C-alpha cells in the first residue's frame, strides 16, 4: 500500500504541474533539455551530421512551436526530443517513469514479453540434464550479488556437467564487475576490448570532479580529470586506452561447450559481456530469437539537469565507444545471436527451466 500511495502522489504531482505551468515555463524546461543535450551529450556529433542537420533543426523548431502554442508540455516534448537520438542512455524521467521510452522510433521499441508470458527472469543455478548446467544471470546491478555469481560457478564446476548455459535474458546491464567471473570461466584465448572517449565539455568535467571527490579521489579518476583539464580544446579524450587486452593466467578445462541465451531486453553492460566473450571464447555460442537492444555505444550516464518547472530529470551519457569514430555502431542493430531459436516464447521465464533452455541444452549435446 505504501508503494501505491507513492505512485499516486507522483501522478497527482505531475497532473498539478501540467495544470499550473505557464507556456513560458514549459518553454524554459524544453530549452534546457536542448541546451544540455547539444552541449554535453557524447552522441550528439555522431547523431546529428551533415545529412540530417536540417531535419534536426526543423524537428527542434516544430517541437518548440508545439510548446509555444500550448499544445504540448515541456516535459513531454523534451522526451520526444531526446527520443530523436534513439539512445536508451539519453532520457528524461519523472517520478521514476521513463518519459523518453514511449517516443522511441519503431526499430528501438522494447517488446513487452510480459504481456504474453510470465516474464520475470530470476537467478538460478541447476542442472538441466546430466551433461548441461544452467546459470540464469538476469542483472548486472547487484541482484544477483558477486558472491552469488561466484557460488554459481562453484556449483557448476562441482556438478560434473561438460556444458554450461548462461541465460542473460532480461539483463539490462549495470556494472561490468558482476559478469567478469563468467568471462574468466569461459575465456580460452586472449582478446581485446575497445575503450571509450570522454566528451570533454565543461559540465561533464565538473561532474567527473564531483564523482571523484565523492569517492575519495581514486587515482584512475584523478588521472582522467588531469588529462581532461590539459586537453580542454579537444572535444573527445580517450578515457584509458583505445583498446585493452583481455588475458587471464589460466584456461578452465570446463565447460567444453558454453551457450549464452539472449533476448531483446539485453543491453548496456550485458552487451559488453557478449562483446568480450565473442573476443575471448571460441567455445561460447550465443542463442536467441531477437538481437539485443543496442544500448552500448554511448555510456557513463549522469543526471544532467532537473528541469526547474516540471521537476523531471534529464540524464545524459558522457562517453562514447572508440568504435564510433571508426563508423561502427552496435546500437543501430544490437548484437545478433549466432543461432536463432525458432520456438514460440516460453510459457514463463522465472526461476524454472524453460523450453528454450531445454532446447539449447539438447543442441549443445549434439555430437
Q: What function would you assign to each model-found segment?
A:
Residues 289:
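Short glycine/proline-centered loop/turn elements that form peptide/ligand docking sites
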Amino acid at each position: 500500500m505504501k508503494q501505491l500511495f507513492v505512485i499516486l502522489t507522483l501522478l497527482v504531482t505531475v497532473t498539478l504541474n501540467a495544470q499550473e505551468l505557464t507556456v513560458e515555463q514549459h518553454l524554459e524546461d524544453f530549452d534546457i533539455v536542448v541546451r544540455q543535450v547539444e552541449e554535453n551529450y557524447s552522441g550528439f556529433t555522431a547523431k546529428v551530421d551533415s545529412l540530417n542537420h536540417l531535419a534536426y533543426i526543423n524537428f527542434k523548431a516544430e517541437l518548440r512551436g508545439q510548446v509555444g502554442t500550448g499544445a504540448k508540455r515541456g516535459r513531454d516534448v523534451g522526451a520526444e526530443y531526446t527520443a530523436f537520438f534513439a539512445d536508451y542512455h539519453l532520457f528524461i524521467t519523472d517520478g521514476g517513469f521513463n518519459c523518453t521510452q514511449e517516443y522511441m522510433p519503431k526499430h528501438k521499441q522494447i517488446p513487452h514479453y510480459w504481456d504474453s508470458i510470465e516474464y520475470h527472469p530470476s537467478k538460478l543455478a541447476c542442472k538441466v540434464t546430466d551433461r548441461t548446467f544452467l546459470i540464469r544471470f538476469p542483472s548486472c546491478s547487484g541482484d544477483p550479488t558477486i558472491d552469488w555469481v561466484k557460488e554459481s560457478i562453484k556449483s557448476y564446476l562441482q556438478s560434473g556437467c561438460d556444458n554450461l548455459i548462461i541465460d542473460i535474458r532480461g539483463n539490462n546491464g549495470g556494472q561490468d564487475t558482476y559478469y567478469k567471473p563468467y568471462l574468466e570461466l569461459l575465456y580460452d584465448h586472449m582478446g581485446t576490448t575497445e575503450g571509450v572517449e570522454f566528451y570533454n565539455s565543461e559540465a561533464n568535467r565538473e561532474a567527473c570532479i564531483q564523482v571523484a571527490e565523492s569517492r575519495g579521489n581514486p587515482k584512475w579518476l584523478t588521472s582522467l580529470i588531469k588529462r581532461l583539464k590539459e586537453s580542454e580544446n579537444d572535444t573527445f579524450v580517450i578515457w584509458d586506452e583505445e583498446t585493452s587486452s583481455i588475458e587471464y593466467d589460466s584456461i578452465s578445462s570446463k565447460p567444453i561447450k558454453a551457450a549464452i541465451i539472449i533476448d531483446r531486453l539485453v543491453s548496456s553492460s550485458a552487451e559488453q559481456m557478449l562483446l568480450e566473450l565473442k573476443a575471448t571464447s571460441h567455445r561460447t555460442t550465443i542463442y536467441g530469437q531477437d538481437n539485443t537492444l543496442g544500448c552500448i555505444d554511448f555510456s557513463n550516464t549522469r543526471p544532467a539537469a532537473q528541469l526547474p518547472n516540471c521537476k523531471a530529470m534529464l540524464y545524459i551519457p558522457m562517453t562514447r565507444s572508440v568504435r564510433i569514430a571508426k563508423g561502427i555502431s552496435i546500437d543501430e542493430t544490437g548484437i545478433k545471436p549466432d543461432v536463432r531459436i525458432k520456438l514460440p516464447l516460453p510459457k514463463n521465464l522465472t526461476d524454472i527451466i524453460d523450453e528454450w533452455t531445454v532446447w539449447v541444452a539438447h543442441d549443445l549435446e549434439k555430437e
